[in-house]
């Protein structure tokens, strides 16, 4: 009988990014278990014996949200966590309207591996942690990564305009690197649980002081690890849309070979020192001027654009991501602001934006079973013609055995109730009430939002780009 010193279990549930139950999704495919993975999936993964294909499975709202239990073991607690991290990294579920807590587990496991797997979290840990991720996403939403890259390339081209050869080379590199840098960065900015995983895994690769990022590890190598962390590396058995593209992989391999050759020639050197040497116009011992010029240009080419990844630790520094930490006694230090109920509710809406209400209606916040009253025989929350205040209860929606009371987002008067029967199945975004609000909605002008986001992006970019250009100069 095999006996292991440690084990860890993750419960895979049908939930959204805020861990609220999310019913109605359908599992169309699920990756096979990998070596060392113990998966109790209630038979969901049994394939059709005749075709060998996965049988679609719909997650009905009338049942518990649990999908599977994932267990890994190891010779110690850290090894079991590392095995679980690899299981979560390589687990792929796909299907229409499907949402699970897979990424939540992946981010959390990376956080514990970075901060201490022997930490002793209490039941008060998860909601503040999710609130912190809401803060991360709120700040990330104010950055346009594509605009930042294009702006950065224009700065490089302006710096190279004195030389036709340098201008041409810079243009080619910018074209080559747009997808190499942009695809993983876009995922990290859009998906807060993955951003948490990245920040945790790379917390020793950088320092953030006074709004400035200093890389302690070669950011080009961090980029390689980022593809691995996101399961977008060349070894991933996935369609092209979900893995690194061939031309990008070739560039990574060339860069890896270049820095390995540099290390052989110059020896192991801390990255800040090595970066300064490679940017210096003075060749070190063992290199002639012509050869060193080629080395220096290659280094600048491989590093071009990687400063964009400095945006991520800057976001973390601004919201205080690393203030959530494990103490010497293994308790967890949680900033007080993350316990504020109103703030928690706001950040939950950032993680999972509620469906947009029209000015004259209120829609269902999620799919599930609709109830107009607290219990049979009790009065309905609202009647037609009744005035309600912001924060008044309007209805209850049951999702996977969880009864959630929904409150009015604004004050107004109910003109018509559109769902008449208790127990009616409603879908997310379905109109439930026709109303007349006390105050008319004013939606943000998309043009103004675009200008605001680009302005914020430029402020971030000035900090990361100026550091790089000043160092090159």
Name these PLM-found stretches.
Residues 372, 398-401, 416-421:
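A residue-level detector for short acidic-glycine micro-motifs
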Residues 15, 156, 367, 392, ...:
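A generic structural motif
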Residues 383-407, 423-443:
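Short hydrophobic beta/alpha edge segments that flank linear recognition/processing sites
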Residues 1-340, 348, 423-473:
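Catalytic cores of soluble metabolic enzymes centered on carboxylation/carboxyl-transfer
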Residues 326-396, 405, 411:
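Acidic, low-complexity mobile loops and tails
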